[in-house]
């Protein structure tokens, strides 16, 4: 049976050996070039392929049409992936009549995503395993073909568990590959309600936070022990690595991070104490704990910290242009909840942010970005992270004021992008789900979906193409001039403070605010073209949490990434949104203050928006990049969002002249 294999690491090597032993004909192997910054303790797939006289390739992008065509020419009957680090596109899966299968290092559906070996140890699991599953477009989500369980012993560290998993994988493949070859397999669908997903880990993720329980810190040490980069902490500005540890149920009133004793080297934690058994100062040699204490100059009562002392004091400065807007004011609230951000904001109004104006770490100037260019340039230079959130983003304005949309959304933002390039500042840019346009994919994917818009004589697309061109400019600056960036695409975020009822009165608001105004005023809810268009509605709290994680950028995982932020489970038509909103309105305690419901009215889009409008039938995001980069998934049900949004707006209405 002819196969093409995607493989890396020890699992890749043993997978190839298992295929050959089972009588498969391997036409080609795709692997990766080794990362010079990574400690290579594992077998080389490239070397094995060369020894077995099998063609081997390591393209930067195996999903490029040229590589897809070359794989098609190999006519594989089945495809296998063994720890290949990049997602493989659906077009490649479809080349093999028998399908594609992936070996994953966990008991799926638990621990989908990256680094499951390390994550199960970080989380203190007592069992994991290996899974062979059918590959589908969503990573690690296909039907399970076979699994083997692996017990995790209390003294297991990453390398010992790795060896256990390799042994289990070898057994699993020996049992399963002949059955796949003969088409004799039983597949079991994964239980989505049990799925968990974890993202990529980097060395910077392994710092020891001493306020946590000693057992949690010990698990971190186990998860990244040699040959992984190791868990680390600081004495002042001196970094040291902890290679092995023990948990002590030491009852101490010492502050977390305090040295309780130096022989043994015992550190107070949020609960209990951690003994550092072996460790290493800087790039030095490994030594036992008491010698390490001497090397670091530690005495009883010394304090350790999770980051260098020189960097622990300075807050990250975040510049938010459009801070009074829907995203801007909610993001400000989230940032100020932490103690390590300084927020600088500019907007033409301050009604939504009035609650922050006296906060010591919030600095606001009222102004227009098209006028206050000097202030903006100075603050781009001064701040660490820039979020240009100013844009006209209401559909009726795209046809009513297309030139103004272009001038503000494109020209003004391009100037800010160039400031970020000039001063080498990180930019987090709000693209839009509108860039996908009339894409026909079931799930809109950041890396593979085509961006399809209508003809030039439909000005409705000026917002979409303005944003898309800015996305491409930012990407090019990142590639050519090293701009540090992340693009995020909100999918129909909604919640309190989304526009306002006055904006809705002139038609310049998003859908839910317009519908609430209709209920408040007793006017018919207008369903444009019947309201059958489907959207995926995302609670503002879910969206802001994802955006906050982009700003945090743990391990720089978000650099150069395009990330959809939406809730694919909250899909509803505009008509369904209206019906859910009406039901919530009818049972609201303030309902008796408002006129009777005036019904639904179907309106043609050309009458409502103008002749230059086109609509999109569906818009559902793939959120695999959000899973991978942010360890994020939305949690809030659409009905809860509707209830809270409605309640917020109803309580802003002056009820003195309403019927009771």
From Swiss-Prot:
Q: Where is this region: Formyltransferase ArnAFT?
A: 1-304
Report the catalytic activity.
Answer: UDP-alpha-D-glucuronate + NAD(+) = UDP-beta-L-threo-pentopyranos-4-ulose + CO2 + NADH; UDP-4-amino-4-deoxy-beta-L-arabinose + (6R)-10-formyltetrahydrofolate = UDP-4-deoxy-4-formamido-beta-L-arabinose + (6S)-5,6,7,8-tetrahydrofolate + H(+)
Keyword Hydrolase in the entry? The reply is no
GO terms in the biological process aspect are: lipid A biosynthetic process; lipopolysaccharide biosynthetic process; response to antibiotic
- UniProt-annotated site: Raises pKa of active site His, residues: 140
Q: Where does UDP-alpha-D-glucuronate bind?
A: 393, 398, 432-433, 460, 492, 526-535, 613
Q: In which pathway does it act?
A: Nucleotide-sugar biosynthesis; UDP-4-deoxy-4-formamido-beta-L-arabinose biosynthesis; UDP-4-deoxy-4-formamido-beta-L-arabinose from UDP-alpha-D-glucuronate: step 1/3; Nucleotide-sugar biosynthesis; UDP-4-deoxy-4-formamido-beta-L-arabinose biosynthesis; UDP-4-deoxy-4-formamido-beta-L-arabinose from UDP-alpha-D-glucuronate: step 3/3; Bacterial outer membrane biogenesis; lipopolysaccharide biosynthesis
InterPro entries membership: Arna-like_SDR_e, Bifun_polymyxin_resist_ArnA, Epimerase_deHydtase, Formyl_trans_C, Formyl_transf_N, Formyl_transf_N_sf, Formyl_transferase-like_C_sf, Lipid_A_modif_metabolic_enz
Active site, renumbered: 104 (proton donor), 434 (proton acceptor), 619 (proton donor)
Q: Which GO terms describe its molecular function?
A: carboxy-lyase activity; UDP-4-amino-4-deoxy-L-arabinose formyltransferase activity; UDP-glucuronate dehydrogenase activity
Q: Which UniProt keywords apply?
A: Antibiotic resistance, Lipid A biosynthesis, Lipid biosynthesis, Lipid metabolism, Lipopolysaccharide biosynthesis, Multifunctional enzyme, NAD, Oxidoreductase, Transferase
Site described as Transition state stabilizer, located at 102
EC no. given is: 2.1.2.13, 1.1.1.305
Extract the Pfam families matched here.
Answer: Epimerase (PF01370), Formyl_trans_C (PF02911), Formyl_trans_N (PF00551)
Task: Kindly list the positions annotated as binding (6R)-10-formyltetrahydrofolate.
Answer: 86-88, 114, 136-140
| Purpose | Bifunctional enzyme that catalyzes the oxidative decarboxylation of UDP-glucuronic acid (UDP-GlcUA) to UDP-4-keto-arabinose (UDP-Ara4O) and the addition of a formyl group to UDP-4-amino-4-deoxy-L-arabinose (UDP-L-Ara4N) to form UDP-L-4-formamido-arabinose (UDP-L-Ara4FN). The modified arabinose is attached to lipid A and is required for resistance to polymyxin and cationic antimicrobial peptides.
The family note in this entry says:
In the N-terminal section; belongs to the Fmt family. UDP-L-Ara4N formyltransferase subfamily.
Q: How does it assemble?
A: Homohexamer, formed by a dimer of trimers.
Q: What is this protein called?
A: Bifunctional polymyxin resistance protein ArnA
């Amino acid at each position: 049976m002819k196969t093409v294999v995607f493989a890396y690491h020890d699992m890749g090597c043993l997978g190839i050996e298992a295929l050959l032993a089972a009588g498969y004909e391997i036409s080609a192997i795709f692997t990766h070039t080794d990362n010079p910054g990574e400690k290579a303790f594992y077998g080389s797939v490239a070397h094995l392929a060369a020894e077995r006289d099998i063609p081997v390739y390591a393209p930067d992008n195996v999903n490029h049409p040229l590589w897809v065509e070359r794989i098609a020419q190999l006519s594989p009957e089945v495809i296998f992936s063994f720890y290949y680090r990049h997602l493989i596109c659906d077009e490649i899966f479809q080349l093999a009549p028998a399908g594609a299968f992936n070996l994953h290092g966990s008991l799926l559906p638990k621990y989908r995503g990256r680094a499951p070996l390390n994550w199960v140890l970080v989380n203190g699991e007592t069992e994991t395993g290996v899974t062979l599953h059918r590959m589908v477009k969503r990573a690690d989500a296909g039907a399970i073909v076979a699994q083997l369980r692996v017990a995790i012993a209390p003294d297991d560290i990453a390398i010992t568990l790795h060896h256990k998993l390799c042994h289990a994988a070898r057994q699993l493949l020996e049992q399963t590959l002949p059955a796949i070859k003969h088409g004799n397999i039983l597949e079991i669908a994964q239980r989505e309600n049990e799925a968990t997903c974890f993202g990529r880990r980097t060395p910077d993720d392994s710092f020891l936070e001493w306020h946590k329980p000693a057992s949690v810190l010990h698990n971190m040490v186990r998860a990244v022990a040699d040959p992984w980069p190791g868990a680390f902490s600081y004495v002042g500005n001196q970094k040291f690595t902890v290679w092995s540890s023990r948990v002590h149920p030491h009852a101490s009133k010492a502050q977390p991070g305090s040295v309780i004793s130096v022989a043994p080297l015992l550190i107070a934690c949020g609960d209990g104490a951690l003994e550092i058994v072996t460790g290493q100062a800087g790039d030095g040699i490994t030594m036992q704990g008491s010698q390490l204490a001497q090397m670091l100059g530690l005495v009883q009562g010394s304090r350790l910290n999770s980051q260098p002392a020189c960097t622990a004091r300075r807050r990250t400065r975040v510049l938010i242009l459009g801070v009074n807007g829907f995203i801007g004011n909610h993001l400000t609230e989230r940032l100020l909840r932490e103690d390590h951000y300084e927020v600088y904001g500019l907007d033409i109004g301050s009604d939504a942010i009035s609650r922050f104006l006296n906060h010591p770490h919030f600095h606001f100037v009222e102004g227009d970005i098209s006028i206050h260019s000097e202030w903006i340039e100075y603050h781009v230079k001064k701040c660490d992270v820039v979020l240009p959130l100013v844009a006209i983003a209401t559909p009726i304005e795209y046809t009513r004021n297309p030139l103004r949309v272009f001038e503000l959304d494109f020209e003004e933002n391009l100037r800010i992008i160039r400031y970020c390039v000039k001063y080498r500042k990180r930019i987090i840019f709000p693209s839009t789900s509108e860039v996908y346009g009339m894409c026909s994919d079931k799930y809109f994917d950041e890396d593979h979906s085509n961006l399809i818009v209508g003809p030039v004589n439909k000005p409705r697309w000026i917002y979409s193409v303005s944003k898309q061109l800015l996305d491409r400019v930012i990407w090019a600056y990142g590639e050519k001039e090293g701009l540090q960036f992340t693009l995020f695409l909100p999918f129909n975020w909604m919640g309190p403070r989304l526009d306002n009822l006055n904006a809705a009165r002139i038609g310049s608001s998003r859908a839910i605010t317009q519908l609430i105004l209709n209920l408040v005023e007793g006017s018919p809810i207008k369903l444009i073209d019947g309201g059958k268009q489907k959207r995926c509605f995302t609670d503002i709290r879910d969206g802001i949490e994802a955006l906050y994680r982009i700003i945090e950028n743990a391990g720089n995982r978000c650099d150069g990434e395009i990330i959809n932020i939406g809730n694919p489970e909250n899909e509803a038509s505009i008509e369904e949104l209206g019906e859910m909103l009406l039901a919530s309105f009818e049972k609201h305690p303030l309902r008796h203050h408002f006129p009777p419901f005036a019904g639904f009215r179907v309106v043609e889009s050309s009458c409502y928006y103008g002749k230059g409008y086109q609509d999109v039938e569906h818009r559902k995001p793939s959120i695999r990049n959000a899973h991978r980069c942010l360890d994020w998934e939305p949690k809030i049900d659409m009905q809860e969002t509707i209830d809270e949004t409605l309640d917020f707006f109803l309580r802003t209405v002056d009820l003195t002249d309403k019927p009771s």
